[in-house]
Amino acid sequence: MLTAQRSRIRCREITGPAHSVALKARPPLSRDIDDIFVRRRKQEATRGEVLEFTKDQSSCDVRMRWERNTQRRVVSATVNRHLQDALDQYQMGIDEKRERLRELLESEELELFKEMEAKKETVLERQAKMHERAKTLRERRESERQRVVADKLDQLFREQSEELRAVQIKRRQDQVCTERESQIRTKEEVRRVQEEEEKLFAQMWESDRLAKEERHNLELQRQRENNLQQKAVLQTQMDMAEQQRIQAKELKQEEAQLLKDQREMLRLEAEREHRQKLQDQEKRRKQLDLSLRLKMKRLTRDRQEELALDMSILEQLLAQEKDEKQDEVLKKLERQEEQRRYREYLSQQLEEQKRLEAETEQLFESELQQAWARREAQWRLEKTARDRLMKDVMDTLRLQIQEKLNENMQKQAEAFKEKEELDRIIQANKLLDEEEKAHFREATKEYQADLLAQMMYRQRIREAEEAEKEYEFQKGLMYEEQYNKKIQDILSRPISSTTAVHPFRRRDRRCSSSGGQMS
């Protein structure tokens, strides 16, 4: 605070343009005290407002906190109540289930006890069953022993009988030859079936390839026809667009010419009105000039007549005076009296003449005014007729121009609509073209994928056939080797009744049995 006061004291010094320093006047102390008091009052008022606002804010915060806590407690109580109700219902459901299960368990236990009571056996019955079971086991064991003894005796007989061994060997050789022939015949049949299948697959492949090539060619032909048709349609649309552009240009030129004609008509109408106004002003000026000239002519004529009359009177008087110089003096007075009376009479006549001329002038003016009024009325009627005719002509011309403008605007609107329709058709054709191209690309991809799948399928079939042939060949070699080993083994050991049947013989037996069942 002191530093600020010192800075304010230093700031009282002001340097002038020369090497001199001036001091500002010190403000009065009363103003500072009043300012301090006012500032302090303002600060106290502001502090009071802040304290009041803080108190209100704190009370609002307390109230809001209490309301939030109350709302939270209410919500918590509601949730707890709903939860307790749900738990009570769940507990009631569990209790009911427990009661039902307990009743079901009791009923099942009772049924089980009843069944056990019903199935309870005595000791004598159990001993009788055990003796029966032991007897059955002894009989089964004795029958198995007898069958084994019979097999051993039969095997011993076959081993000791040379004739039986020779017959069996001969029979087995015949059977092996028959089975070999059957195997060869089966291989031939399998090879024939495979060849027929290959031919069938080749025919199907060729027919499918030809059909797909035909479809592809038809699709290409249809695509070319569609392209040519779309090209023709686009050319037609371009020609129509060019015609519409030329028509729109002509319509704009016609509209510009119509607007120019309308402006020229307005200019001519304004020029006609201006010329009519000038003509009216000229007519009015001519009327005023004519009336002024007539009035000036009349005044000039009156003055000339008065001057001529005065000159004639003076000449007569002078002549009479010259003649009367020789008369008597008495007659002079009489003549003067007569001259006075004559002058009075002349003045009266002059006044009467002026009055008559005034009346004549007035009549002339009235007749002239009537004539001018009639002429003006006639001119007004003619002007009204001309104006009406000109107005009709202008209205007709304006109506024609407006009709042409409306027709031009309608043509432009129709041309715009046709252009929009043409643009829409072009866009639709473009979309159709894109869809057809996409469909063609998709069909081409599907065709390629189909061809590739068929090639892979044929390759897999060929590989599977080759693998199956190789497997059959290896299997045949293995069977032949096993067969030879088995022949050698059979020839080298005694013949038994438990000899395994060859797979081909077993297959032939199964085929013959199935054929018999089918028949």
UniProtKB/Swiss-Prot annotation:
Cellular localisation: Cytoplasm, Cytoskeleton, Cilium axoneme; Cytoplasm, Cytoskeleton, Cilium basal body
InterPro entries: CFAP53/TCHP, TPH_dom
Positions of region (Disordered): 498-519
Gene Ontology CC annotations of this record: axonemal microtubule; axoneme; ciliary base; extracellular region
Disruption phenotype: Embryos display total organ heterotaxia. At 48 hours post-fertizilation, pericardial edema is observed and heart looping is reversed or heart fails to loop. Morpholino knockdown in the embryo results in minor defects in the motility of pronephric cilia while the majority of cilia of the spinal canal and Kuppfer's vesicle are barely motile. Reduced number of outer dynein arms in Kuppfer's vesicle cilia.
Keywords of this entry: Cell projection, Cilium, Cilium biogenesis/degradation, Coiled coil, Cytoplasm, Cytoskeleton, Developmental protein
Signal peptide residue numbers: none
Function noted in UniProt: Microtubule inner protein (MIP) part of the dynein-decorated doublet microtubules (DMTs) in cilia axoneme, which is required for motile cilia beating. Regulates motility patterns of both 9+0 and 9+2 motile cilia through differential localization and recruitment of axonemal dynein components. Required for cilium motility within the spinal canal and Kuppfer's vesicle and is involved in the establishment of left-right symmetry during embryogenesis.
Family according to the record: Belongs to the CFAP53 family.
Protein name: Cilia- and flagella-associated protein 53
Originating organism: Danio rerio
